[in-house]
Amino acid sequence: KDGSGGYVFAQYEFDAYENNDNYDWLDAVTRTGVEQNHALSFSGASEKGAYYLSFGYSNKKGMVKNLGDTRYNGRINSDYSIKSWLKVGTCLLYTSPESEIFSDDGVYDKARGANPMLPVDSEIYTLNYGGIEDNNYFNPIRTLKIENDRRRNRLSSTNFLNINPLKGLNIRTSFSLDFFQEDRFKYTPKDIQESIRYSQDGQAEHTRDQRMVWQWDNSISYDRIFGKHKINALFSTSATQTDRDYTYATGKGYGTDRFSYYNIGASYKTDERSIGSDFVTATLMSYVVRADYNYASKYYLTATARYDGSSKFAKGHRWGLFPSFSAAWNIAEENFMKEQRVFNQLKLRLGYGL
């Protein structure tokens, strides 16, 4: 007995002690994890181009019951020289993972910390030590009844065109697109402690996060060497737009668990329904001019200017000019440094920029 005259141990604990019983709650919520991966690829090349195709499938069954992941993916890489001065290429990637994940209430940790003298029982709502009920210590076997699924789709593509019309002159344009969508579905049944404690009588949730980003880059560069003089000039532009759509819906109170998260609007607790959305579009535009000059790999001059604009800033403050200048002296290339053995590289550089 304890100081108040009550029993420290409950009767079931005395029985387990007398019968030398030891109950493994962890075994009740775990299994042997299995993972399988399959891949198929094709590739080829010629003097004018090359290609690569791959397809993959993977399936994982986690150590905790109901924990799993199925994934499909595909990839295409290709580049081709249409003419000696014209080259095109593309890269396409698709992934589609689908996951069944257990509730955030910590199935594994609760089972690992369960009372080893408490008989494994899926019908009790909480795990107890002694005769004390702990409403925070949910039965992990019942927690496995929570449906918590996630589906993702992602498609990304990058394409380019490269032109070399004259010696030293390069013109390049590239366009990339990245689309991502994630759906999360969760249903907490009405007859488990997580629902009973918070008077949910069943709760259904659905969230969707969708994003699309596109970027278009263009550049013209000229690179030539005239005796000891080397020049490089670049002009480039970049435009990016990001669109994000986010929606969510939650319902509480269901007469049956039969419909899971498929009919959120059927909840009878209408004052506890929740729905919301968020739509955001952001754009970024950049212009870059750069000129490099060096003489005999000794003396260097560089001038750069960026002109950037972003829709995230207030009107009247969306554009900014950022110039920079630098000069360098490669002292190690001077004749008076040839005989010394202390330095193999010594350069002095000064720069200024915003």
Stretches with model-predicted labels:
Residues 1-21, 32, 62-156, 172-285, ...:
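Surface-exposed loop/interface segments of Gram-negative outer-membrane beta-barrel transport/assembly proteins
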Residues 29, 37-59, 63, 75-81, ...:
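Predominantly transmembrane beta-strands of Gram-negative outer membrane beta-barrel pores used
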Residues 35, 39, 60, 284-287, ...:
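Conserved interaction-surface patches within small, structured recognition/assembly domains
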Residues 44-46, 57, 80, 92, ...:
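Residue-level signature of outer-membrane beta-barrel architecture
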Residues 51, 287-305:
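Short, contiguous hydrophobic alpha-helices characteristic of membrane insertion segments
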Residues 55-61, 301-313, 350:
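Transmembrane beta-strand segments that form the barrel wall of outer-membrane beta-barrel proteins
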